[in-house]
UniProtKB/Swiss-Prot annotation:
This is Aspartate--tRNA ligase. Disulfide bonds: none annotated. It holds the Pfam family tRNA-synt_2. The lineage of its organism: Bacteria, Pseudomonadati, Pseudomonadota, Gammaproteobacteria, Lysobacterales. It comes from Xanthomonas oryzae pv. oryzae (strain PXO99A). GO terms for cellular component: cytoplasm.
């Protein structure tokens, strides 16, 4: 139906006859001439219709051109010629196609929005097929496509095996709710959609495949936000006979190559490395954005003897923290803006936010200054590096909570005070805690997942020091986003059983849920490790968008709905009966 793509028509084709197909982007009838911007996936070319006096065929052609509306689907035949008025904004701007024939392949109904408009998100998602025609959406989807293609080429060239793992599998706890699928042939039993291929890829290492990868679809029934969807895609990788640096060095080289190929970005020749403890101490986050130079400063030792009980209580608590965040130029903040920062911190658990504001002339404005002697106050300001024109925020309380809300303030301040440097800041975060304590459940939970190896090989040591145990987990962070997470795995069945026990998973429960894994580990499992990268998140970063929904062809809303297909939707009673499911009225 076509000989060339619209966006690729250029001067080399001048004088030649071409056949094009695409959508009417714009049609302009200027009376004596019609201009049609014809669009396909490669771009736009101008089609010109010039009626010739006394020529019935050209008059009919002009009539067809004048009748065109937005998004009508056309086939156009014509001769390429040089444009009199060059359009430098178009790749095809030096040429035009003089139409000799126009066939309307399909008329478009009146549009809810035009391809060059940017309507509200609900409208975009309801008419996703129209939204995806927009040039910006085409660009972002193509970025994702190029990313996946580049990853496959890179890994295939290095002897990785692309192996599929099951979509219908066993329900195993991995931190989020499973999506459950009734098993029609086994009444009362259910499959689960995989939250990740974690256990299968470990078993593939036991099976001797050595290097595995998969562009894997994963499913988690959890609350949605801009960087989270119910179903998502990850690059899943696993290596046999490796230590942490083997995995990290390989994927670091891979990311440098991929970013260069896909978006022509040169990532750092060597990614910085930071332990989890250092990241939390300096930045209040396990995925710090290193483009923001602001750092948290611990001040517990300087406020232990103050008369401010909020500070003294936290400073004298072994699990407490008093941290300061200096914002250069922050003295310009009004009281209302300071209250806004306090409200932002409250979202992350802060019960209050103390501050010291120093005017350009050195005047102090602070609700906590009265709790300090003159020398102690001066020492505090010196310790945090505060000067005229600055504001210093303080957080006090439990270590983790203070780190969280002060880290959130750091990000907010960095953006609002234009302190985010240009460029790309990759980072390895290592040495994560093995466990964290769940006050509600009164037990340990795995910080990464239950299959991450501890840094110690001795089970007795792990049991005795579970509270402070460090794992062999690692995350790759880019511009404040965790783009990949991995670890060295447990490959000994006795260690895996001990970790289950520390997580409150007894032998009987472990056998019921993970018996297949424990059995596999018993038959000569090699030391192994791996990592998984979020394709959606990396594509969003490459495309320069805040929301992963922009790089997913058919995403869900934050309300977990597909507005285009109207999913989820009720199921007929006979279908439910086939899978032995009965809907009960919601209890009020």
């Amino acid at each position: 139906m076509r000989t060339h793509f619209c966006g690729l028509v250029d001067e080399t084709l001048i004088g030649q006859t071409v056949t094009l197909a695409g959508w009417t982007d714009v049609a302009r009838n200027l009376g004596g001439v019609c201009f049609i911007d014809l669009r396909d996936h490669e771009g736009i070319v101008q089609v010109t219709v010039e009626p010739v006096a006394g020529d019935d065929a050209s008059a009919e052609l002009f009539k067809v051109a004048a009748s065109l509306g937005y998004e009508d689907v056309l086939q156009v035949e014509g001769v390429v010629r040089a444009r009199h008025a060059v359009n430098d904004k178009l790749r095809t701007g030096k040429v035009e196609v003089i139409a000799t024939r126009i066939s309307i392949l399909n008329k478009a109904a009146p549009l809810p929005f035009h391809a060059h408009e940017n309507p509200g998100e609900e409208t975009r998602l309801k008419y996703r097929y129209l939204d995806l025609r927009r040039p910006e959406m085409q660009r972002m989807q193509r970025t994702r496509i190029k990313l996946v293609q580049a990853l496959r080429r890179h890994l295939d060239a290095r002897d990785f095996q692309d192996i599929e793992t099951p979509i219908l599998t066993k329900a195993t706890p991995e931190g989020a709710r499973d999506f459950l699928v009734p098993a029609r042939m086994h009444p009362g039993e259910f499959y689960a959609l995989p939250q990740s291929p974690q256990l299968f890829k470990q078993i593939l290492m036991v099976a001797g495949f050595d290097r595995y990868y998969q562009i894997a679809r994963c499913f988690r029934d959890e609350a949605l936000r801009a960087d989270r969807q119910l179903e998502f895609t990850q690059l899943d990788m696993e290596f046999a006979f490796v230590r942490e640096r083997d995995v990290q060095d390989f994927v670091e080289d891979m990311m440098r190559a991929i970013f260069k190929e896909v978006v022509d970005v040169d990532l750092a020749a060597q990614f910085p490395r930071m332990t989890w403890a250092e990241a939390m101490r300096r930045y209040g986050s396990d995925k710090p954005d290193l483009r923001i130079a602001l750092e948290l400063v611990d001040v517990a030792e300087l406020v232990k003897s103050s008369e401010f009980p909020v500070f003294t209580a936290a400073a004298n608590d072994a699990d407490g923290r008093v941290a300061a965040l200096r914002i250069p130029g922050g003295a310009t903040l009004s009281r209302k803006q300071i209250d806004d920062y306090a409200a932002h911190a409250a979202k992350y658990g802060a019960k209050g936010l103390a501050y010291i504001k120093l005017s350009e002339t050195g005047e102090v404005n602070s609700p906590i200054a009265k709790f300090f002697g003159e020398e102690a106050f001066a020492a505090l300001l010196k310790h945090v590096g505060a000067g005229n024109g600055d504001i210093v925020f303080f957080g006090a309380g439990g270590y983790t909570k203070v780190s969280d809300f002060m880290g959130a303030l750091r990000l907010k301040a960095g953006k609002e005070f234009d302190l985010v440097a240009e460029g790309w800041a990759p980072l390895w975060v290592t040495d994560f805690p093995m466990f964290e304590w769940d006050d509600e459940a009164q037990r340990y939970v795995a910080l990464h997942h239950p299959f991450t190896a501890p840094a110690v090989d001795d089970i007795a040591d792990l049991r005795a020091n579970a509270r402070t145990a460090v794992s062999r987990g690692y995350d790759m962070v880019l511009n404040g986003n965790e783009i990949g997470g991995g670890s060295i795995r447990i490959h000994r069945p006795d260690m895996q059983s001990a970790v289950f026990e520390l997580l409150g998973i007894g032998a009987e429960e472990a056998r019921a849920k993970f018996g297949f894994l424990l059995d596999a580990l018993n038959y000569g499992a090699p030391p192994h490790g791996g990592i998984a990268f979020g394709i959606d998140r990396i594509a969003a970063l490459m495309a320069g968008t805040e929301s992963i929904r922009d790089v997913i062809p058919f995403p869900k809303t934050t309300g977990a709905q597909d507005l285009m297909t109207d999913a989820p939707s009720p199921i007929a009673a006979d279908q439910l009966a086939e899978v032995h499911v009965q809907i009960r009225a919601k209890q009020v």
